[in-house]
């Protein structure tokens, strides 16, 4: 039955779900997932959702920071200390103590409380007239254009009253009786209220216009007014409440106000404390905006420990009329006080000395030192701990050192005695073995800070949280320890044993580590500019070495002037700081190293002389230059796009290269590489060159391996392949006899005229589109390693052999009556196959070559003068290089 009645409730637009009692009350922040810091400003709203009309007397808001310590004896009891507290009234009549700000560490923040009543009495008339005129103008605009339902907020006497109008019933004015009643369509009012509610959810403050019914024409108009709260700049409050729906019966009941009640209320206008204490709010979602400012001093990090907590809570209370209980809502703020550990000085070593005074045993002093690397660390980091012991005897203990990271908490509340607590966070156990000769021992261990601990908090009398590293040492070496069930050893019990000492040092755990530009970095940057400019001015001329030589990666190195110099041109060094990649080499390689060494030696010799401090600093800056050229340097990417390829041994002398990429002689490269040292003495410069080399060539850091060309096939294999090609040609009549007669006649290949060059197949066959037919007999076949599928088939008769290939020229073809010879297949060549050379100035083609052969054959040249194809192929060493 109850669920059936719930369906009959009026529906209105709301993003919220009702609670068990039918109402919903909570605090909403504009930035809900933010971590707050001292001095920040908090913006938010107190939202009240009503599913039936109720009388709400007041809505109060308080913001307080508390330190709570639980009782160790009685469960559920404890003490509470207030760091600061702020109170303000969001809805209802302000009282003498409704708006206050109590901060122990700040000045007077509640001066406006005593003057709130005076300001209200002095400005009540102006507030009333302004609101009446605004209400009338807004009602007129709303009746004509329902879409415009907002108006600017009202001010009085220069005091900003940042608040919104509400749908409450107030009878503070007498001019409303003479004002014509305004009417609004209920549907239009609903749309306007929904729009206002949606816009208010974005954080903006809107002013809704109330609606009245036609039944209220004779009785008057319900006032849409609010009670302003005078605030100060430090703690300001805004009050905003929107109604999302209105019903005809509700509005008619609220707008029915008699003239007598208005006149009686006007008589009590001068005393605001006697105004109505409860106002009926309609069905809908009501929003009360507020602004709070967090104090800048006297605060601690939000945390919870075993015996208490430090919290910052925003509490809202809505008091309802009658016996109904008040509504409470809380919102906890996570406050973090920044602690920067970047500039904390390193802690001093903690030293403990124990003097041994016994008659029977050896006397002396045992010294123990505890060192921690830095003064502060962040949560989740690990830090080293070093313990140094100088003993008087040899000690061997398997578990002689216990290093513990612990937290000490000290809390004082309500003028009670301070309460101290300790909690172990991390612990390591290490063996203790002293040297039998020196009786000394150095132990290094590592402790890890848990990520869930809170930062160091101190500087206030109420609470303090410090972190310490405690070391317990068994100097006697008689421990027999067993681990506790929780994994931590109770050091308090160990300290009671004989021959046990302990020492500790403080460690600060911060919230962040900011990067600062130190003065040393700026000085180093200035020195780098000075050194670079000095090198550009003094060592930029030819004949000097600028930080080593640069081999040409692309193999386009230039031969020198006949003295074996190896360089890459006159590339000047850049003077920009940090750019050491554009180095150049000119002249003798050994001259640069000796020049720099002499320069540094001279600078060192001047140091002993009576020079000024400025001159000494200049010499020291010059000493930062590398003492010899680097063995491996990385040029710029624009000048040298790839890595060099060197040849070793006979390959350098025997390899053939084109005219566009000549290589340096082997003795020149060997001399340059040998003259460069393996490891420069300047470590910083060597590391800089190595990193820059890796940026351009990832393999520059590895040992150089000479790049060899792919090994070609042996001449015998090539001859076999060519014979297979000839075997595929169909046999011709008389082929056997002709082959037998010309077996010993060598043939010469056609070259392109360059020693060690290549045969240009397209240019040779450019003038003949079809294979010409020549009558004659050719003794032998002309073969070559083909790189093109294009070939020329020549058939003809010949009675004589061809002359030597060096005398091949373009002559006319002479016909002959000899039998037809087998076809000769001439393929394009990729390399020299014989001593024959074709003049590059002669534009010879395939047909011209065959005509020359036939002409020489017809002239009666002996067959023995033709070169042997097989012999020339086998005797040539650099054919396939």
UniProtKB/Swiss-Prot annotation:
InterPro entries for the chain: Arrestin-like_C, Arrestin-like_N, Arrestin_C-like, Arrestin_domain-protein
PANTHER family, A to Z: ARRESTIN DOMAIN CONTAINING PROTEIN, PH-RESPONSE REGULATOR PROTEIN PALF_RIM8
One Pfam family recorded for the sequence: Arrestin_N
GO biological process: positive regulation of transcription by RNA polymerase II
Annotated disulfide bonds: none
Organism of provenance: Yarrowia lipolytica (strain CLIB 122 / E 150)
Gene: RIM8
Listed Low complexity bias regions: 93-116, 129-177, 269-278, 523-535, 551-560, 787-796, 810-819, 828-845
Protein known as: pH-response regulator protein palF/RIM8
Region (Disordered): 90-223, 242-280, 515-612, 779-881
A GO CC term attached to the entry: mediator complex
Family assignment from sequence similarity: Belongs to the arrestin family. PalF/RIM8 subfamily.
Biased composition (Polar residues): 117-128, 178-215, 242-261, 571-587, 595-610, 846-873
Function according to Swiss-Prot or TrEMBL: Required for the proteolytic cleavage of the transcription factor RIM101 in response to alkaline ambient pH.
